[in-house]
């Protein structure tokens, strides 16, 4: 009988989380949702010196922002130490593990001799119990590590969902340390116990874990567990072709939110960063879950492309509800010095956002464009001298008169502009540029008629009249 699908995301909270990391959460999340299974969040925090609550919070915040909800967890390895010690004791009792008293200095010397002899450096089994073998006398006052009795013969084989069939001879694997002298268990051991206890059926993770897999499979089988399906994802490269990392300039997941990206755009982009569904570039979260499979995971490293993500974000911004975008824009407006009172007494932010979003690739850009509606204009003196000339002043005066009498609609404002152009034999930029400067404080705005309608008749008329006085 097929086991119910159970996947996991098992990050180490030792630093910030970037897109390459969070992709290892997205794919197992999607597979669990597709298969009506269970998605488990496990925090692998046994590296006490490097782990931090701040990093845990960043993981949880990033997952929440992207909508990667988990069914179980977060489960912390440090809270499972009693269980690990129980299994270690069981392995010692059953002869699956043994104490090793070889010191770090002795191990280094052994490896150096092996290198000089042209051999692969590895533990030589000095303290491994064998029938008829006489072990050295344990040195006084030395606490041993525990090593797993790896099979000496045979081959570890698994059918990786990405890499295909992988075979590793047991002769290439030495007896792995599974507990330190103070009794604390090692990562590779904890992972096996966790995956077994949590009935994980599919392990979807980065291919930097491939070398751990044969060791983990051997420990799992020794404990009577059934190996999961493994899918080792190729590395995510940055735009320079290096492995994505903080050291090489990767942004944290939440930095994308803070730069004005929408979570649905990031999820869509991440989904395509190592998986494909035909030629589909843009798809909803629901479509992604429906289409996701392990068979179409990419076999080559995927390279991050910021311009592609920006293009996707621009698409989702155009599709997004104006009220939602307005709420998202407020923190950016606040950072630009626009106070809540100015927004409350100015043009409706929903409408302003609706006008600005077609020109923006991020919510931050929407806010930067929207700010002119909530500030007193301070146009550049050189720009004023260039555009608000004596030749155009009569046209501005006529435009003000027309706007005072017009219905306050985009169509009526457009008609007033065109009528003024005709009367004074001007081209649109000759009139629109000074109007933009005087009303908005900048020459860069969307369609002038739409902008004037949002500013409102009183503001438009008073600002142009003030310049003509």
Curated annotation (Swiss-Prot):
One of its GO terms (biological process) is glutamyl-tRNA aminoacylation. It catalyses: tRNA(Glu) + L-glutamate + ATP = L-glutamyl-tRNA(Glu) + AMP + diphosphate. One of its GO terms (molecular function) is tRNA binding. Its EC number is 6.1.1.17. GO terms for cellular component: cytosol. It comes from the Bacteria. ATP binds at residue 246. A motif ('KMSKS' region) lies at residues 243-247. Gene3D superfamilies: 1.10.10.350, Glutamate-tRNA synthetase, class I, anticodon-binding domain 1, HUPs. A motif ('HIGH' region) lies at residues 11-21. The keyword Transcription regulation does not apply. Keywords: Aminoacyl-tRNA synthetase, ATP-binding, Cytoplasm, Ligase, Nucleotide-binding, Protein biosynthesis. It is found in: Cytoplasm. PANTHER family: GLUTAMATE--TRNA LIGASE, GLUTAMATE--TRNA LIGASE, MITOCHONDRIAL-RELATED. Monomer. Belongs to the class-I aminoacyl-tRNA synthetase family. Glutamate--tRNA ligase type 1 subfamily. Catalyzes the attachment of glutamate to tRNA(Glu) in a two-step reaction: glutamate is first activated by ATP to form Glu-AMP and then transferred to the acceptor end of tRNA(Glu). NCBIfam families: gltX_bact. This is Glutamate--tRNA ligase. It comes from Burkholderia ambifaria (strain ATCC BAA-244 / DSM 16087 / CCUG 44356 / LMG 19182 / AMMD) (Burkholderia cepacia (strain AMMD)).
């Amino acid at each position: 009988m097929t086991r119910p699908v159970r996947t996991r995301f098992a990050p180490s909270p030792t630093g910030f989380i970037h897109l390459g990391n969070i992709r290892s959460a997205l794919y197992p999340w999607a597979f669990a949702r597709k298969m009506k299974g269970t998605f488990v969040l496990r925090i692998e925090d046994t590296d006490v010196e490097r782990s931090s609550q701040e990093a845990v919070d960043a993981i949880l915040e990033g997952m929440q922002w992207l909508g990667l909800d988990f069914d179980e967890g977060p489960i912390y390895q440090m809270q499972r130490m009693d269980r690990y010690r129980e299994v270690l004791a069981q392995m010692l009792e059953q002869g699956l593990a043994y104490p090793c008293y070889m010191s770090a200095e002795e191990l280094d010397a052994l490896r150096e001799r092996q290198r000089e002899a042209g051999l692969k450096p590895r533990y030589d089994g000095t303290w491994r119990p064998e029938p008829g073998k006489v072990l050295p006398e344990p040195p006084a006052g030395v606490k041993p590590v525990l090593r797993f009795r790896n099979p000496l013969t045979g081959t570890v084989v698994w059918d990786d969902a990405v890499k295909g069939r992988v075979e590793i001879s047991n002769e290439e694997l030495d007896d792995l340390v599974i507990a330190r002298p103070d009794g604390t268990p090692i990562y590779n051991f904890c992972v096996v116990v966790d995956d077994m206890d949590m009935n994980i059926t599919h392990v979807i993770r980065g291919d930097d874990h491939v070398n751990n897999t044969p060791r983990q499979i051997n420990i799992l089988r020794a404990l009577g567990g059934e190996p999961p399906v493994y899918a080792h994802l190729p590395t995510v490269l940055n735009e320079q072709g290096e492995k994505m990392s903080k050291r090489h300039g990767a942004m944290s997941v939440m930095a994308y939110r803070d730069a004005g990206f929408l979570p649905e755009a990031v999820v869509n982009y991440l989904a395509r960063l190592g998986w494909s569904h035909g030629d589909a570039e843009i798809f909803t979260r629901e479509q992604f879950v429906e289409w996701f499979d392990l068979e179409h995971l990419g076999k080559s490293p995927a390279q991050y492309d910021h311009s592609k993500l920006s293009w996707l974000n621009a698409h989702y911004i155009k599709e997004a509800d104006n009220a939602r975008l307005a709420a998202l824009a407020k923190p950016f407006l606040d950072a630009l010095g626009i106070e809540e009172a100015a927004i409350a007494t100015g043009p409706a932010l929903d409408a302003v956002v609706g006008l600005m979003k077609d020109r923006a690739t991020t919510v931050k850009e929407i806010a930067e464009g929207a700010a002119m509606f909530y500030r007193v204009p301070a146009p550049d003196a050189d720009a004023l001298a260039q555009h608000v000339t004596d030749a155009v002043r009569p046209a501005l005066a006529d435009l003000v008169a027309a706007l005072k009498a017009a219905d306050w609609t985009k169509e009526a404002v457009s008609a007033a502009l065109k009528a003024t152009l005709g009367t004074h034999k001007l081209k649109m930029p000759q009139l629109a540029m000074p109007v933009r400067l005087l009303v908005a404080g900048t020459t860069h705005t969307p369609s002038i008629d739409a902008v004037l309608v949002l500013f409102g008749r009183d503001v438009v008329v008073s600002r142009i009249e003030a310049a003509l006085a």
